Design a protein with these regions (language model features):
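Hydrophobic, aromatic-enriched alpha-helical segments typical of multi-pass transmembrane helices
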Residues: 2-31, 38, 42, 46-201
Length: 202
């Protein structure tokens, strides 16, 4: 097993941990609703079992960042533009900042600067990721062995962007958790498949 396969495994474990986190949220917290509550409410200030869920989020964020650091060289032997991987690295840095320093305010609300920074960083991270998806499509569309993934990357960017818009519309509604789940799943699935591709091609 080489270094690229190791970082790819980190990338595959990350979305599994993140998804397991919010699934366990519904199991371990009777007050938590997948229909009403967003994922970030699990690690809001004062939330029940916050430290338990923090472990999942922090570990997931760090593992994903480690994968991003090796992404450029893990794709097509490092041939092509740095733009996509750099966008992913920037997104990963913001994700770590959110995990360590910027939880939502008590009750999963956005009231003071910390909660507002959570929203700003999460949205910015998501948009950087979507831009990274598009950049990888440009980089890999004509590369043998990667063209199918390139098309998947473009489709993921479009779908993720639309789901972000829908989630934003319902952000204050009673169904924000239900609407958010497809969005986060689209991102997590992309992370897993990208990591799997790096693992299989190295």
């Amino acid at each position: 097993m080489n270094l690229f396969q190791i970082v790819a495994i980190c990338g595959m474990i990350s979305p599994i941990l993140y998804t397991l986190m919010w699934i366990l949220g519904g199991v371990l917290r009777p007050d938590y609703s997948h229909i009403r509550d967003d994922v970030s409410s699990l690690i809001a200030v004062g939330a029940p079992r916050k430290r338990f869920f923090d472990v999942f989020l922090i570990t997931s964020s760090v593992l994903l960042f480690v994968f991003y650091l090796g992404l450029h060289w893990g794709i097509n032997n490092g041939e092509g533009s740095f733009v996509g991987p750099i966008l992913f690295v920037a997104s990963g840095i913001l994700g770590i900042l959110v995990a360590f320093f910027f939880p939502l305010d008590p009750g999963g609300e956005i009231v003071i600067r910390r909660g507002k920074m959570h929203l700003i960083l999460v949205v910015t991270s998501g948009l950087l990721t979507i831009a990274g998806m598009v950049a990888l499509w440009f980089r890999l569309a004509s590369v043998e062995g990667w063209s199918t993934f390139a098309n998947y990357s473009l489709v993921s960017a479009i779908v993720s962007f639309l789901l972000v818009i829908i989630a934003a519309i319902f952000m204050k509604g009673r169904y924000r958790g239900l609407v958010e789940r497809p969005m986060v799943t689209a991102f997590q699935l992309y992370y897993f498949i990208t990591s799997l591709m790096v693992f299989l091609t190295n």
